[in-house]
Structures are given as C-alpha cells and as structure tokens.
C-alpha cells in the first residue's frame, strides 16, 4: 500500500472508484505516513485521524461516485481556512482553541467532490511569513533537507504533499505563499486569478490580495483541484461570475508550437543566485525546443517597486483585519486585566507573535493621518502601474516565465531576526497578487539537493492556458528524485 500514496489524484481515484482499493486503506496509508514523518517535518497542526477514518468507512459502505473527482481521497488544508468542528488556529496563540461552527466555501466544495479532510497544516502565524518559522506550534521542516525551511506561509501544505502525507493540500497565497513553498519543496503550486476561488471562510490577512489554491505533485492534479475549487460564491463579494472550465480535460496541448513566452528582464538581476539563474535559463531553452517563441519584455515596476508596494498595502489591510482579535469577541483572552484597555493590550500582546505585531504596527503607521498620502495612497498608485505593466506585455505574449524564489530553501533560524531579508525573498511573486493574476510554480531542477522552481504567469482568468503550458514544461523539467524521508 505504501506505493499507492505516491500516485496522482486521477490514478488513486480510478483505484477507489473501481474498488481495487478501499477508501479506508488509502486513508490509513496516509495516516501511517503522517505518523512516520511528522516528528521529522511537523507539517500538521491538527491530524483528523478519527474523523477521516470514520468518513472513509462511510464511503466504503456507499456506492462509488465517478462524477466526484476527489471521491475518497485524503486532502490536507491550511489551518487558516475554517473547518466545521475542527480547530482552526491560523498557527497563532490568539486562536489556539478556536473551533469554527461552519466550513469555508472551498471546504464545502472539497466535501462535495468527495474529499476526506485528513488534517490542518502548519503555516506562518496568520499567513504572515515566507518560511513557516513564525508558527505558534513550531516550524515546519523541509522534507528534502530537514535543516532547511519549507518556505511559507503555506509551508505545512507544501511539506505534506512533498512528503506523501496526502495527495494534495490547499494553501493560501497573499504574496507568494503557495508558489514559493511549492518551489522550495519540489511541488506544483497554483495561485488562481483573484476572485476565481472564494475567500469566504478564510481568515483574512490582506483581503485584496488573498487567494486560495492547490499544492500538488503534478499539473494534472492542480487542474483537477482547481476544477473543484473554482465556483462562484455569493457569500464573497469579490467572487467572479466568469465561467470556469474543466481544467483537467483541457490539458490537451502536446507541445508549445504557436506559444509566445515573455521573459521579463527585471527578473534576471543581482537578486537571484547564479545556480538558480542557470536552471531558469535552461527552462527557457527547453521551452524553445518544445516549439515556443520567446521575447524579452520589461515590467519596470514588478520587482523592487512591487516589494515596497506590497508590504505597505498588505500590512495596512492586516492592521484592519486583525483589529477584531481583541480578547472580547473570541480568541485569546488575557487574565488579570482590570480595565478594558488593559484587556485589549494584554490579549493582543500575548496573543500575537512578533512578526504579526510588526506588520500590524507597520500597517497602522501607513494608514495614519500624517502618513496615508505618502505611503498607502502612493502604494495604491504604484499598484495600478504594476497592473498596467502586465496588461501591456500580454499584448505581445501568451504567458510569462520567471523564477519563483531568488534562492533555494535556507537554513532554519538563519533569517528569522532579519525581516527585511525575508521580505525580499518575495521579490518574484508579490507582483502577481498586486495585479490579481494567476501564477503556477513548477519544479525545474535541484541545486545541492534542494528543489528549484520556475513560475508561469498567465492572463487574468486564463488558468486553462497556464495549466496547459505548465503541464508540458513539467514533463521535461524538474527533479525525478524524491525526498529521502
């Protein structure tokens, strides 16, 4: 059974529907893998063993439903997404005992598709980070090298997929938090277009930037997951009415003939380590061999300008969103507070970690009367310029190809006290969130045994093209080895 946990979603689905494997034994195999590897990687905050096995037994007693693409398949979920009667902590002391009374919209979609929620994965506290080191429940470790970070903030989701603890995991992406950990863990990471997937029931970090998406081991699996998740939700006012596709069926292209790929010159800079630049350039050459035409383009505001813009807008929105955690309505409540003001101060001081407090303070500062025009208003203007840059280059190409991370996974603890250094690791990812565009991270090689990813950037609501091109490239790129766990 051990080999079955290495199968794709489509493969394990076929075995379950045909009754060649029972849902219970597949679920138990994933739980056994979690038990064996969790002491090493700490990918989960909550493991839903009892609930998952109970649901598996129910499904085994029912008639398999081939129309449900995730029927009987164990899926992991990032722990900032609400799950009814299952703790949802956002990896924070503030919510360590919080149990939601309803499911997020995307959890409903997973269940409607037949999925089994096997557990809630670790993350940077309130999804604020790039390494999954700021979690109240301890850091997650990279399955490829457990001395290194898995990336973040969806590091637990990426590590769980890379370690074969589940068949897919859901993450959220505010500035690269699906794509970057997927790249550092050798997985596929898809950030859909803003509005493609509902945010209802996701604990908000930055509402105009947040987007949920899948982390998988193949592009085909990402297409299956997106087909499940991408539905209009009237509970989310930013949820798109645009029609969605069966993204899996649409993976028809065999080569890249007729495709024009844009190469933004700003993404080839001193920020990127030379071995990663080599892999990126090899990916460009591979695309050409597969029939693509490449052209050099410019996105003048999409790197250094984007970092500053992102950290102003994201922290401003975080300051507003996290104001609700005050020790009164729900969440951590400090004891021995004699006044309401003391209760607020003590609850938030003890309930939030250092990085969350840093971002709240920064966001409050840029929204203050004296600094709003110079910071937040100016950042909103630059955000518009970033979007215009992308709209301009997409008149000349079908898709963009860039690096994901300027470096491979770094050693745990090496940058935790260097916030500016950590922020700059998002330099190739944040511009997509500011522009609301879809991005796909795929493995492209190894450097000293650590995975390197490349990023495909698509036009708004054209995930079909993004996945189709990514599927072709993934078959010719990336590590063929697996983490040695």
Swiss-Prot record:
Q: What is any one GO biological process for this UniProt entry?
A: translation
Enzyme's top EC category: ligase
Q: Name one GO cellular component term.
A: glutamyl-tRNA(Gln) amidotransferase complex
The UniProt record lists the keyword Transmembrane:
no
Q: Which UniProt keywords apply?
A: ATP-binding, Ligase, Nucleotide-binding, Protein biosynthesis
Is Transmembrane one of the keywords UniProt gives this record? no
Which family would the database say this protein is a member of?
Belongs to the amidase family. GatA subfamily.
* Protein function: Allows the formation of correctly charged Gln-tRNA(Gln) through the transamidation of misacylated Glu-tRNA(Gln) in organisms which lack glutaminyl-tRNA synthetase. The reaction takes place in the presence of glutamine and ATP through an activated gamma-phospho-Glu-tRNA(Gln).
**UniProt gene name:** gatA
Subunit details:
Heterotrimer of A, B and C subunits.
Gene3D superfamilies attached here?
A: Amidase signature (AS) domain (3.90.1300.10)
Entry protein name: Glutamyl-tRNA(Gln) amidotransferase subunit A
Give the EC number(s) listed in the UniProt record.
Answer: 6.3.5.7
Q: Which domain of life is it from?
A: Bacteria
Q: Where is the active site?
A: 78 (charge relay system), 153 (charge relay system), 177 (acyl-ester intermediate)
């Amino acid at each position: 059974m051990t080999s079955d946990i290495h199968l794709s979603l489509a493969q394990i689905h076929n075995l379950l529907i045909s009754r060649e494997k029972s849902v219970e034994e597949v679920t138990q195999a994933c739980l056994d893998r979690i038990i064996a590897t969790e002491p090493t990687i700490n990918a989960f905050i909550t493991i839903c063993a009892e609930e998952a096995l109970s649901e598996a037994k129910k499904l085994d007693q029912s008639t398999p439903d081939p129309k449900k693409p995730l029927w009987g398949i164990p899926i992991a979920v990032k722990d900032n997404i609400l799950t009814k009667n299952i703790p949802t902590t956002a990896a924070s002391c503030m919510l360590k005992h919080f149990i939601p009374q309803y499911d997020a919209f995307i959890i409903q979609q997973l269940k409607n598709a037949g999925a089994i929620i096997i557990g809630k994965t670790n993350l940077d506290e309130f999804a604020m980070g790039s390494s999954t080191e700021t979690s109240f429940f301890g850091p997650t470790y990279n399955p490829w090298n457990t001395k290194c970070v898995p990336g973040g903030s969806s590091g637990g989701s990426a590590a769980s997929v890379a370690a074969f603890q589940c068949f897919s995991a859901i993450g959220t992406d505010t500035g690269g938090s699906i794509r970057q950990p997927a790249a550092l863990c050798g997985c596929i990471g898809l950030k859909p277009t803003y509005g493609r997937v509902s945010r209802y029931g996701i604990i908000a970090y930055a509402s105009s930037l947040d987007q949920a998406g899948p982390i998988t081991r193949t592009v085909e699996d990402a297409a299956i997951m997106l087909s499940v998740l991408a539905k209009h939700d009237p509970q989310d006012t930013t949820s798109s009415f645009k029609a969605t596709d069966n993204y899996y069926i649409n993976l028809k292209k065999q080569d890249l003939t007729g495709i024009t790929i844009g190469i933004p010159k700003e993404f080839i800079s001193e920020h990127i380590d030379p071995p990663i630049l080599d892999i990126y350039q090899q990916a460009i050459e591979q695309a050409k061999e597969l029939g693509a035409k490449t052209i050099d383009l410019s996105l003048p505001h999409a790197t250094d300008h984007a970092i500053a813009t992102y950290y102003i807008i994201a922290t401003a929105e975080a300051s507003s969103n996290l104001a609700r955690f005050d020790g009164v309505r729900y969440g951590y409540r400090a004891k021995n507070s004699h006044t309401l003001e003391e209760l607020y101060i003590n609850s938030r001081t003890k309930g939030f970690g250092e990085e969350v407090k840093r971002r709240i303070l920064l966001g409050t500062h840029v929204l203050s009367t004296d600094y709003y025009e110079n910071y937040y208003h100016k950042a909103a203007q630059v955000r518009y310029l970033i979007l215009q840059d992308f709209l301009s280059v997409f008149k000349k190409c079908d898709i963009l190809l860039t690096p994901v991370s300027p470096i491979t996974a770094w050693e745990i603890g090496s940058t935790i006290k260097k916030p500016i250094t950590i922020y700059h690791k998002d330099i190739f990812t944040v511009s997509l969130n500011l522009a609301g565009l879809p991005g796909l991270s795929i493995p492209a090689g190894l450097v000293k045994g650590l995975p390197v990813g490349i990023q495909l950037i698509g036009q708004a609501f054209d995930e079909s093209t993004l996945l189709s091109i990514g599927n072709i490239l993934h078959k010719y790129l990336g590590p063929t080895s697996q983490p040695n766990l």
